[in-house]
Structure formats: C-alpha cells, structure tokens
Amino acid sequence: MPASPLPEAHRRAAAPRLPEVAESEVSRHYQAMARHAFGVCDGFYPLGSCTMKYNPKLGEDLAALPGFTGIHPLQPEHTARGCRSVLDRAGAYLCQITGMDEMTFQPAAGAHGEFTGLLLIKAYHVHRGDTGRTVILVPDSAHGTNPASAAMAGFTVRSIPSTAEGLVDLEALRAACGADTAGLMLTNPNTVGLFERDILAMTEIVHAAGGLVYYDGANLNAIMGVARPGDMGFDVCHLNLHKTFATPHGGGGPGSGAVGCKALLAPYLPGSALGGGGGAQSIGQVRAFHANFLVVVRALAYLLTLGNTGVRQAAEGAVLNANYLKHRLEAAGYSSAYPGLCMHEFVLTLEQLKKQTGVSALDLAKAMLDQGMHPPTMYFPLIVHEALMFEPTETETPETLDRAAQALEALLKTARENPQALHAAPVTTVIGRPDETAAARRPVVRYGFEEG
C-alpha cells in the first residue's frame, strides 16, 4: 500500500529543536531522581486505599522472559500458546477468587475497568429494551472515580448517604431505588475500611428494583480467599491487578483493571474475553489486543506463588496489620473516625487536634516525611474531616508497625507542645511544601532550554 503524503498544513517547516544532552548527564539526572523518590522498597508506605504492598521480584524476572517480551499480538495464536495459557489460567484463578463466571484483561487500569463494567450494565439494560434505567447509585464514601466513570458511561449519579457508623444507609438505598435504577457501585470493604455487613440485603434491594450491582475491587485485598463478591450478589467487578495482585503501580502504569462478570453479562464482554465475547451484543474492544499483558504475567506469578492458602493468609495479614496499627495509634491518643475493628485500612480524624493546636492532617503528613515514612492518604474519604487513611498491608512486619507507631506518637506530642515545628515540616526533604495548585495547573513536562 503506497504511503499517503501528509497534508501540507501538518508538515514541519523546519527541523524540531531537540535537546543536546550527553548520555552521562541523562544517567545522572535519573539517578538523582531515583534518590529523591520514595517507594515500597525504601520504607513504610501506608497510603490508604492504594494497597502499597511489597511486590516480589520473581514477577519481574518472569515478565522479562523473551518468550513474553518478544511476541507480537498479530502473530498466529498457535505460535503464542504459552501466552494464551497465561491469560486463561490467570482468568480462571481470578474467577475463582471473585465468584465470577468470565474475565477480560482488556481494561488498562482501575477506572478503565469501572468504565468497562458500567458499559456492560448499560448494554444489558439496552438489549432488554429497558432504556429508562439511567441512574447509577454511588455511596458518599466511594472513590471519586466511581461517579466519574458512571458519568462517562452516560449515567446520572445519585449519591447514597452513609450512617454514623460509616456504612451505607439501607433505608436511603431502598428509597433511592426505582424504575430508573441501572445499578449500584460499591466497594466492600468500603472506603473507610469497614465491611458492609448488610451486603446481602443491599444487593437484594437493587436486584428487586431491576438494577445490577457493580463491585469496585479496590479493597479486595482484605477479603481475597475469604469471601467472594459473586457470593454477595455482585454481577460485575473490576480488579486492580496492579494493587491486589502485587504488580508494581504508581508513576502512570502500566496497570490492569481486569473485569469479571456473571454469565448474564458475558455476551457483552469485549472481544478478547476468556471463554467467548466479541459477538453481536459485545460492547466492542476497549483496548488494543490483550492490553497490558505483562501485568497479567506478574499477577499470575503472584497467585501461583501464594496458592489458595497463601492468598487467604495475605488477606488475613492485611486485616491484622491494620487493626494492630489502629490500636497502637488510638492508645497513643489519636482519634479514629470509626472506633472498633476495621478491615485492611482505617481512617483517623485530626479535627479535634486541629481545633486545639492548629496542626492539620497536612501538617502531620508532611512531618511523617522527616521520619522516613510515606504519608497516608490525606483528606479522603471526604465524609471525614481532617482525614488520614492508613493501609499498612500484609507485607509490613510487626517491627515496622511498632516503629511507625512510635514515630507517630512522638509527632502527636510535638503537635501539642510545639505545633510550629509541624507547620514547618518537612525539613529534611529536597522539596518542602511546593505550590501544589500551581503544579497541577502549570505542570512543567518538557525540556527547559537555556537561552542566551
């Protein structure tokens, strides 16, 4: 096929201006950035709702095998049967863990998985001629991506309030359901780290109204191998392989937001779904080929390493570590937003501390940097004032949790005795308190030429 000329309007009039940088300078630049960065391999990283667990390096070794890195998605399938086996086995294991019937690995990340799952729900209702179902119900404690994904899929979002206990208000859910209900998006355990104990009643309410129930797998790490979303009444789910199944995440990817569903939604799956998909009712591809295949390789390595028993132990360890740290911090004088046992994460509120001392959640988080720890998630969920959300994960040792608790206890004492010290934090990092608003609105993302 002959090349077609680029239209004149899109051709360069002159050669592009490119940086002239020595390889040694490039190497030093990235080495310096690496020294300034902080990751799970550097220290305690309790970033709530992000599951920053240690990722076994075995997964990296296997994902680097030439048999995986040297394939091409358009080569004949009989020449890539090993790769096909990876997708099949990983999908089967994840269906077993979630209680779903089918799995697709096309979505490239969590929010992409949400969007895909919602398109399945939409296709289901449209195919049945039930086009009046245009509302997705979302708890007020949900991840911000939930309402955003629902809006992108063409739905109207209706918020469901939480009770004082941090759980979905059943009566409010019942009142919100109706003939316009397409579905409910839910995380369980929820975003404040509590298990929705009325989950069976909740899914029954939505199903009785004619809607479907979507499981946001962001917090699956707390229940994998113990309880299955499919058994709770969920019809479709997404999984963050780059969180729960120990494939590195952060920095923009690659990720994998695998989507699983019950048999009633299988006809609508994207074309490369396991066990079928791609028929007349399919929503169509949401990503080219098999998407981020090497992330699936890492996840399969993790699953095969742990086995059934290990997967359950990982979930139990995550819950144990969260409750241990929560108890230590409460004993030190911190206030929990929701007292009692938690699941894999918990939320502290510094509202009273701020009123008493002027020290905010931001101040404490910045001070943690000086202690060699990554801060927890700040000011989320939005229903908790001055929130700090901790998720220690199962890969942290008791000694690490003890050191973290001791450091946080010392910071609390400093907040009460010398609040100005926390207002000035951090003092040991290369960057102190940048103008985050300016950074978000005017990012510097290209090479800066020295003029003159």
Region locations from a protein language model:
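Cysteine-centered functional microenvironments
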Residues: 72-75, 105-107, 187, 243
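Conserved PLP-enzyme active-site core in the AAT-like
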Residues: 21, 82-85, 112-281, 320, ...
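Conserved phosphate/anionic-ligand binding catalytic regions in large, soluble enzymes, centered on
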Residues: 38-58, 106-117, 245-260, 290-295, ...
